[in-house]
């Protein structure tokens, strides 16, 4: 069984993380480990109709963001890596500066030190120079910066289409193949 850590921070776009968990429920060989910041809980209630209970039920394992002794806080716990979707600037800053004040940033720090993939879906705009420098520093220490920027070549017809394309592309970063792609991939002109 492959394990993927899914982090949801307080940035706008909680629906991306929720959809990722929903999609991974149908992937038999991937076990999801969810950690949500306190701010993520608030964003979830402000932006979606999903309850915290529903989101937790979508994950195979849920970790309390305050539990720094959780399995995902150790490098000996084998995982494919971690995605933080969405990733707030606060979370990005904590990761870059190794400020592991909770499980979300601790798990990310562990993934980096173990040289496993860490995908940060930074959800902020516009960006000032400090934000850009943080993203550069994160990339320099091994993270993949992957803002949830929609593509339009697949001609999305709904918000779900836009979300699905991003979720599918995030899973590509971990070489997780879905039974069926969530969007039409570019085949050339």
Where are these regions (language model features)?
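A cross-family phosphate/adenosyl-ligand binding-site feature
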Residues: 1-119, 123-189
